Amino acid sequence: MRPVPGPSVFWGAGSRLPAPLVARAHRLLRTRRANPARGASRITKDMNYWDYIHVEELLALQGGFDDDEQKVGNDEALFIVVHQIYELWFKLILRELTSARELFRQNPVPDQKLASAARSFRRVVTIFEQAIEHFRVMETLTTRDYLDFRDRLIPASGFQSAQLREIELLLGLDDALRIPLGREGSYKEALKTADGAPSAATRRVEARLASGPSLKHFLDEWLSRTPIDGSSEPEGVVGFLRSYTRSMRQENERRVQMAIDKALTPPDVERLRARYEAESAAAEAFLLAEDDPAADAATREKRRAVRAAIVFIESYRELPRLAWPREVLDRILEMEQAMLIWRQRHARMVERVIGRRTGTGGSAGVDYLDQTALRYRVFGDLWTVRSLLLRKPSVPEIEHASDYGFRVEDSP
C-alpha cells in the first residue's frame, strides 16, 4: 500500500503547523493506516444524483393512456409533464402550510417561531408565482394540437387534483363557498372512481380532513388571544373598537370637509357624505361583529376579538412585539393573493387554448374557473380590514404601548 503523505506535503517542506494540529494529523494518519477501510467506506457508499432524485423513475412516468411513451406525441408529453410539475409544487405547498398550521396549533404560539411561519408563507407565494409562469409553457399548445387528444381525457379533470383540494382544506376554505363542478353533489364525489368506489384521491382528502382543523381556525384562535391595549377581556376589546370607529368617523368628516374646500357642488358633497356614512356604519357593524344577525353571542365575541386583533396589529405595527405578527398577516394576505392570481391565470390559459367549451369533467369550463377565482377566499377578515385602516395621525392613542416593547430583564 502506498504510504500516506504527511502534512508537509500539503503545506510545503518549510511550513510550520501549530503543535496541536501536527499531533492531531499524526493521530489521524495512524488511524487510517490501522483501519484503511474506515475512510474508504464513505466513498463507496456515497449517494449519486440520479439515485437521490430518482431520475429514471421520474422519466418513466410520461407514458400517457397506454403507459407507452412511444405512443405519446410532443404536445401530449408537454401536457403531462406540466401537470406533474404542478402536483410536485402542490406537494411542497402542503408541506409548508402543514408546518405553519402545526405552529399555530400551539397555545401559546412561541413569538420566536413567527419568523419561520412568515418564511413558509413567503415560500408558498414564490411557488405560486413560479407556477403561474408555467401557464406560458401550456400556451405553446395550440387548440387543434390539444383537441387531438383531449377527448381521451373525458371524464378526467383538473378538478380531480386531490392535492389542490387538500390545499383548500388546509387553508380553511368554507364548504359553503364551493362551486359545484356540474354533475356531482360534493367535490368528494368527483374524486371517486367511475363505479363510485373510493379512490387514492378520495383517501388522500379524507386523511387531510381527519388531520384536524385548518390553518385559518388556528390563526383565528391565535389572533383572538391577542391583548388589545394590554387587555384580553371582552370589554377591553369593545372599548378599543368603539374608539377606533369614532376615529374612522372623524376621518370621514375630514374628507367631506376637503371636498367642500375643493368647491364640489352641494349635491356632490351630500352624495359623498352619504357614501362615507354608509362606509362608517358598515365598518362599525363588521368590527363589532353585528354584520351576521344569525350568529350567536359566543361566535360574535370571537369574531370581535379576531377583527380587533387584526386592526390593532396593523395600526400599531411599529411597536416591537407587533412587528412579526404584522409580518405574518401580510404574508398570509400575499399568499392568498398569489393563489387567486394563479386561479385567474389558469382561467385565461384555458380560455386561450380551448375557449369557453364545457370542461372534460363536465364543468362550465372557464366560467367555473373564473368563479373560483372570485369566490374562493379564505382570509376574508384580512381583506376587509384593509378598507378600514387609518392614517397614522388618525389612529387613536393607546394607554399601554409599553406592554408591546422589547422586554429586557433586570440585571442581578
Curated annotation (Swiss-Prot):
InterPro entries for this protein: Trp/Indoleamine_2_3_dOase-like, Trp_2_3_dOase
Record flagged with keyword Transmembrane helix: no
Cofactor binding mode and count: Binds 1 heme group per subunit.
In terms of Gene3D superfamilies, this protein maps to: 1.10.287.3810, 1.20.58.480
Catalytic reaction equation(s): L-tryptophan + O2 = N-formyl-L-kynurenine
Pfam families in the cross-refs: Trp_dioxygenase (PF03301)
This entry's Gene Ontology molecular function terms read:
heme binding; metal ion binding; tryptophan 2,3-dioxygenase activity
Q: What EC numbers are recorded for this enzyme?
A: 1.13.11.11
- The entry's keywords: Dioxygenase, Heme, Iron, Metal-binding, Oxidoreductase, Tryptophan catabolism
Top-rank taxon, per record? Bacteria
Q: Provide the binding site for heme.
A: H346
Cofactor(s) it depends on:
heme
Keyword check for Metal-binding, yes or no. yes
Going by the record, the broad EC class of this enzyme is oxidoreductase
Q: Where does substrate bind?
A: F79, I80, V81, V82, H83, Y146, R150, T360
Q: In which pathway does it act?
A: Amino-acid degradation; L-tryptophan degradation via kynurenine pathway; L-kynurenine from L-tryptophan: step 1/2
Task: Give the transmembrane ranges.
Answer: none
Q: Which GO terms describe its biological process?
A: L-tryptophan catabolic process to acetyl-CoA; L-tryptophan catabolic process to kynurenine
Main function: Heme-dependent dioxygenase that catalyzes the oxidative cleavage of the L-tryptophan (L-Trp) pyrrole ring and converts L-tryptophan to N-formyl-L-kynurenine. Catalyzes the oxidative cleavage of the indole moiety.
Q: Which family is this sequence assigned to? A: Belongs to the tryptophan 2,3-dioxygenase family.
Give the multimer and partner information: Homotetramer.
What is the protein named?
A: Tryptophan 2,3-dioxygenase
Tell me what organism the protein belongs to.
Answer: Sorangium cellulosum (strain So ce56)
